[in-house]
């Protein structure tokens, strides 16, 4: 037991920012980007060494906020500034998944993101009463890119399936026919048919033996100086601007507005320090016009 405790406390790096999913639902990539970076680097290196037939395809990665408050205010990934140990990587990657690579095209990427955007309720701009931003669709299904190479907007005033706007790759509208390799996990690659058909296993080009968590640990060991600039600031998506008559609200960890501010989310405000749920959460609002 002591050996196990010692192992999980093994230092692997250092972070200069608080890596959390507290505001992942409104655009903070702080705990997701390093997972995507690790998955992308791992898959790209394998393809280069072993799969020459895919060497010309861009390799991208998606991941999701696995802990996003379902069980209350403490149910978020939240890694403090300072030393990073193996147990922190387990917080950054909760599940015992393995890395899988799938081949898709630009049209598939849009449809994949449309499915992920079920995370949000449809917001009525004319409604003057409070509207809840987050739906019952689980946070662990809210796949996102976290790279400057891919940019898109999510229009929450639109119905499910029509929310992804201005999707670009390298600054140009994504080519629906262009092929890409996406690094993800075995669960999404084989059980994700509700996202796109190719996520029934048929799109998989490499089923790696390695756990996503171990890939993250290895990546941090190789790149131990983790920083907001390099590992926590690449916002691929934002909400499409919308003027809403009433407040658009969501819950997150108690009194954590400083985390949103540190992530540059100037459109988030604290509405109530105690949202009355008894779960240790606060109520926040997001101004979609900003």
Task: Tell me what each language-model feature is.
Residues 1-290:
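Catalytic centers of hydrolytic enzymes
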């Amino acid at each position: 037991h002591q050996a196990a405790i010692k192992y999980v406390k093994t230092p692997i790096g250092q972070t200069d920012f608080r890596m959390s999913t507290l505001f992942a639902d409104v655009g903070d990539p702080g705990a997701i980007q390093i997972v995507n970076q690790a998955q992308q680097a791992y898959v790209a290196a394998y393809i280069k060494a072993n799969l020459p037939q895919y060497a010309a395809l861009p390799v991208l990665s998606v991941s999701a906020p696995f802990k996003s408050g379902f069980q209350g205010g403490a149910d978020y990934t939240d890694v403090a500034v300072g030393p990073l140990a193996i147990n922190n990587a387990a917080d950054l990657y909760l599940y015992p998944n393995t890395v899988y690579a799938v081949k898709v095209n630009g049209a598939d990427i849009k449809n994949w993101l449309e499915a992920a955007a079920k995370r949000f309720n449809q917001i009525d701009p004319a409604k003057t009463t409070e509207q809840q931003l987050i739906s019952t669709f689980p946070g662990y299904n809210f796949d996102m890119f976290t790279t400057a190479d891919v940019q898109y907007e999510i229009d929450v005033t639109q119905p499910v399936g029509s929310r992804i706007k201005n999707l670009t790759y390298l600054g140009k509208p994504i080519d629906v026919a262009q092929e890409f390799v996406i690094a993800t996990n075995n669960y999404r690659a084989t059980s994700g048919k509700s996202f796109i058909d190719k996520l029934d296993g048929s799109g998989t080009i490499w089923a790696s033996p390695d756990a996503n968590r171990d890939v993250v640990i290895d990546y941090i060991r190789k790149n131990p100086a983790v920083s907001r600039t390099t590992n926590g600031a690449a916002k691929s998506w934002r909400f499409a601007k919308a003027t809403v008559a009433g407040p658009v609200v969501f819950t997150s960890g108690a009194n954590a507005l400083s985390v949103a501010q540190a992530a540059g989310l100037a459109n988030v405000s604290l509405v109530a320090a105690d949202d009355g749920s008894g779960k240790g959460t606060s109520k926040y609002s997001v101004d979609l016009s900003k």
